[in-house]
């Protein structure tokens, strides 16, 4: 399609802050670090490691629970019904949205991988079983 990133067009390095929606802390924290004269440590996708350094599944409170075979069962791991947490890096498990109210897994929904390269196309369909490495 000929689509290029800002970094490709401008020929400069960029810091990527993905998400749907992007958490305000990720933006403000990154800008504050830059204003303080510090460069955030970035991962291979150009994202700040402080926010995108660990897989959601590694810190998920449901990781060790029974694997759900269908939706609507409170507290079970949603990996078998399509949760993208095993492949998605973000600190959603500790950050929460709406002033600390909740996050996708806490709302009994699955992670849709919104902070990963290729979202949403690479992670569609959202509600489909996937094979994961762990």
Regions found by a protein language model. Give the residues of each.
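Terminal, contiguous helix-loop blocks that mediate binding/assembly
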Residues: 50-134
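Iron-sulfur-associated redox domains of electron-transfer enzymes in respiratory
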Residues: 1-89
């Amino acid at each position: 399609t000929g689509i290029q990133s800002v970094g490709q067009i401008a020929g400069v390095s960029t810091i990527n802050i993905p998400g749907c929606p992007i958490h305000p802390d990720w933006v403000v924290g990154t800008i504050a670090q830059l204003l303080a004269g510090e460069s955030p440590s970035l991962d291979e996708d150009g994202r700040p490691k402080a926010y995108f350094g660990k897989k959601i599944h590694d810190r998920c409170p449901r990781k060790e629970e029974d694997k759900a075979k269908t939706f609507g069962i409170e507290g079970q791991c949603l990996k078998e019904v399509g949760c993208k947490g095993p492949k998605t890096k973000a600190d959603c498990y500790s950050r929460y949205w709406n002033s600390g109210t909740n996050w996708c897994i806490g709302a009994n929904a699955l992670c849709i991988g919104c902070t990963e390269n290729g979202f949403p196309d690479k992670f569609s369909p959202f509600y489909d079983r996937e094979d994961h490495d762990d």
